[in-house]
Amino acid sequence: MLEINISCPNVKEGGIAFGQNPKAVEAITKEIKKRARQPVIMKLSPNVTDITETARAAEAGGADVLSLINTLTGMKIDIHRQTFALANKTGGVSGPAIKPIAVRMVYQVANAVKVPIIGMGGITSAEDALEFILAGASAVSVGTANFYDPAATIKVAEGIEKYMEQHNVENISDLVGIVK
């Protein structure tokens, strides 16, 4: 699979990240699909008014899978130097603080498109991962947690297996999107 990150808040084109423009998302997805030999995952930006618009655009362009969310745009100010702490003034915020937003967006997108979703954003435990799955993610991705615990992903997977045993769930797909 090939994941295309169309949502980096640090790279701008004409003042707006092109991943925030549904027409641009559909067009770039179509172009990539014409050339790609493998399934295409489009990584969506959360920095939009309605993420379902860009999700539908990516699906219309032929995306095989959607991954969401990428980082939220944030800012840090160095109070001692009284200036921006980041070279671009703004940058991506990730980790546990964005999880409630990410779960909401996965839920919204899962109810708007038919393609599978990889949920991400603040997953540090099996409980976090299960929230994404119950909201509609077919798979999850663990990022920031791996920096402070290299075994985080293994712990998440083991915790999901334990949950499934405790709840007599044979196939994880039986949990995908069951919270309505």
Which ranges hold each PLM region?
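Residue-level recognition of conserved structural "scaffold" positions that shape functional pockets
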Residues: 102, 128-129, 150, 166, ...
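Small/polar glycine-rich anion-binding or flexible loop at a beta-alpha turn
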Residues: 123-127, 149, 180
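Alpha/beta enzyme core
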Residues: 1-118, 124-135, 139-142
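C-terminal helical cap(s) of enzyme catalytic domains, especially alpha/beta-barrels
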Residues: 77-91, 133, 145-170
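A short, charged, Gly/Pro-tolerant segment at domain boundaries
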Residues: 173-180
